[in-house]
Amino acid sequence: MNVIKTEIPDVLIFEPKVFGDERGFFMESFNQKVFEEAVGRKVEFVQDNHSKSTKGVLRGLHYQLEPYAQGKLVRCVVGEVFDVAVDIRKSSPTFGKWVGVNLSAENKRQLWIPEGFAHGFCVLSDEAEFVYKTNNFYSKMQERGILWSDKSINIEWPVQNPLLSDKDINGQKFVDADYFI
């Protein structure tokens, strides 16, 4: 497993070694020991989620507050997405900064988004299936959303006129969001 640092040090790309031949391929998609060594702490995943979306769908920017803050290990198993993490930790030197990574069934990369980040993605292919592990359970009461198009964050989304849920259309401005300390 190759671990790649992003512009935001706590957000990491995990790139598996893929062994292929005329029969197909094999890869180790997750290894707890390698993962914990890379992130520098013990992480216990408690839930796996799987979504399917069509081209142009944008989901985000989502996060949960304590005590239900979630770290996410995300990947795209069908198609391709542009995946984004926004640092919402007030005490961080990268507060308000974002990082974007293309994740696809072809590149098989995964992105680690720790607690204290808002997360979103948009679908670049005709359809995409998105799978992710979380280290905390979903909590409707602690769920929050930041407006995907907030000008103060200025994410360079590679889609025009995205398809959005009502929840994502009505996300909070970054300046009004609930941050992490």
UniProtKB/Swiss-Prot annotation:
Pathway note: Carbohydrate biosynthesis; dTDP-L-rhamnose biosynthesis; Bacterial outer membrane biogenesis; LPS O-antigen biosynthesis
Residues the record marks as active site: H62 (proton acceptor), Y132 (proton donor)
Site feature (Participates in a stacking interaction with the thymidine ring of dTDP-4-oxo-6-deoxyglucose) residues: Y138
One GO MF term: dTDP-4-dehydrorhamnose 3,5-epimerase activity
Gene that encodes the chain: rfbC
Protein name: dTDP-4-dehydrorhamnose 3,5-epimerase
One cellular-component annotation, GO: cytosol
Entry keyword annotation includes Isomerase: yes
Subunit description: Homodimer.
Sequence positions that bind substrate: R23, E28, Q47, D48, N49, R59, K72, H119, E143, K167
GO biological process, one term: O antigen biosynthetic process
Primary enzyme class: isomerase
Pfam family, one: dTDP_sugar_isom
Annotated catalysed reactions: dTDP-4-dehydro-6-deoxy-alpha-D-glucose = dTDP-4-dehydro-beta-L-rhamnose
Organism, scientific name: Shigella flexneri
EC number, UniProt record: 5.1.3.13
Family of this protein: Belongs to the dTDP-4-dehydrorhamnose 3,5-epimerase family.
Function of the molecule: Catalyzes the epimerization of the C3' and C5'positions of dTDP-6-deoxy-D-xylo-4-hexulose, forming dTDP-6-deoxy-L-lyxo-4-hexulose.
Presence of keyword Isomerase: yes
Record keywords: Carbohydrate metabolism, Isomerase, Lipopolysaccharide biosynthesis
